[in-house]
Amino acid sequence: MARVKRGVEARRRHKKVLKAAKGYYGARSRVFRVAKQAVIKAGQYAYRDRRVKKRNFRALWITRINAQSRAEGLTYSQLIAGLKKASIVLDRRVLADLAVYDKAAFAAVVAKAKSALAA
């Protein structure tokens, strides 16, 4: 059986990593050893931050809802409690969109929550 050298496979692997590292600064885009570490780390950041993004957006939505609901005379927690009491099922993304883009509709939702809390 003939001896198998791994030159072709190594070249393919190096090209794959260097292609993934395209656009990185300095040696990170040119030197295989450094590029490999940079690509691995980038993958870890991407994986982590896909989850962090969800937390960040939820926090942003809550901040926006709280700001607008305070302008209407309720705190965020009172608003959410009132919506639960009134059996109004709107997620935070929709509430935040209403708070930013349709203030009249948001005011109507807050009024429903207020009446549910009063009852």
From Swiss-Prot:
Domain of life: Bacteria
Keyword NAD: no
GO biological process: ribosomal large subunit assembly; translation
GO MF assignments: rRNA binding; structural constituent of ribosome
SUPFAM superfamilies: Ribosomal protein L20
GO CC annotations, alphabetized: ribonucleoprotein complex; ribosome
Keywords in alphabetical order: Ribonucleoprotein, Ribosomal protein, RNA-binding, rRNA-binding
Family note: Belongs to the bacterial ribosomal protein bL20 family.
Protein's recorded name: Large ribosomal subunit protein bL20
Species the sequence originates in: Cellvibrio japonicus (strain Ueda107) (Pseudomonas fluorescens subsp. cellulosa)
Lineage: Bacteria, Pseudomonadati, Pseudomonadota, Gammaproteobacteria, Cellvibrionales
